[in-house]
Amino acid sequence: MADVLTGKGFLVTTSLAAGLTAGASEIITVIGLSVANVHATVDSWVTVDVNRDGGVDSELGHQVNIPVNDSLDMLNGGKIVLNNSDTLDFIAENASSIEASISYLVQT
C-alpha cells in the first residue's frame, strides 16, 4: 500500500460540487480542512458534506457563516475518512467568496 501526503485548494461556488473524491482504489484521510472568506465586503455561508458511496451521508457544517476576511477549521483537529468513490462536497452562499484548503493522506 502506497501512502501520499498532499493537499489542494478549492474555490467553492454556489453549486454543490466535489472538492475531493476518493478514487475507486483509494482511501483518503482528510487531516486538515479550512474554509476562508476572501471577499472584501460580503459575509458568506458555506455547507460541507461528506457524500458516502453506498453509505449514510453527513454534513460537517450547514450554512456556517464566515465573516469577511475570516476562516474556520472545519475539523477542529479531527479527521475524516473517505472510502472509494466517497466525496467531500461544498456549496457557498456567494460566488467567489469561499476558498477551501484541504490536506489529506491518500492510501492505495
Name the predicted role of every residue range.
Residues 37-45, 94-98:
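Extended, low-complexity, turn-rich repeat/linker tracts enriched in Gly/Pro/Ser/Thr and Asp/Glu
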Residues 63, 79-80:
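Short, surface-exposed secondary-structure edge patches
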Residues 64-72:
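Short proline/glycine- and polar residue-rich coil/turn motifs
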Residues 37, 52, 104-106:
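Beta-strand elements of well-folded, non-transmembrane domains
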Residues 71-79:
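Exposed aromatic-hydrophobic patches
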Residues 80-94:
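Noncatalytic modules at the cell exterior or secretory-pathway interfaces
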Residues 1-28, 32, 91-108:
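C-terminal interaction-tip segments
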Residues 40-63:
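Short, surface-exposed beta-strand/strand-loop-strand elements in extracellular ectodomains
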